[in-house]
Amino acid sequence: GANASQPNLIMVAGRVAIGATGAVGASVGKLFTVTRTAAGLYTVTLDSNGAVPAIVYAAANLVFATGSDTQTVSILTLDATNKKITLQVNDAGTVDTAADPPSGSILQFLILVQNTVSVG
C-alpha cells in the first residue's frame, strides 16, 4: 500500500510543585520534564522519540499557595527543534522581571504539538 503522512496533534498537560527558592518538586503528567534554569525561569522538555515538526499551542499558569500571591507566568520561547518551551514567572509589581514563585505554588501547563505519523 501507499504511505501517507498525516499531521496529528498530541496534547501534553502537566503540573509541578514549586518548593523553596523556586525548586522543581513532584510532577503530575507524562511526556515531559521541567527544570529551573534561573530565578523564575523554567524549561519544559518534551520526552518524544520522534520529531516535533511544530509546537501548535502552549499555555501556562500558576496556582498559588496563598490568595495574596500575584505573580504571572508567560511563554518566552517555543522551540520545536529541541522540543523545549521556556516559561518565565514574573513579579507582578515589576513587569518582565523574572522571580521565583512562592514555595507551595503549582506551575501548570498545556502544550499541543504536531507529530507526523506514517499510515498506509
Task: List PLM regions with ranges.
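Cysteine-dependent deubiquitinase/ubiquitin-like isopeptidase catalytic cores across multiple families
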Residues: I55
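Extracellular receptor-binding modules and their adjoining Ser/Thr/Gly/Asp/Asn-rich linkers
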Residues: G1-V52, N61-Q71, L78-G120
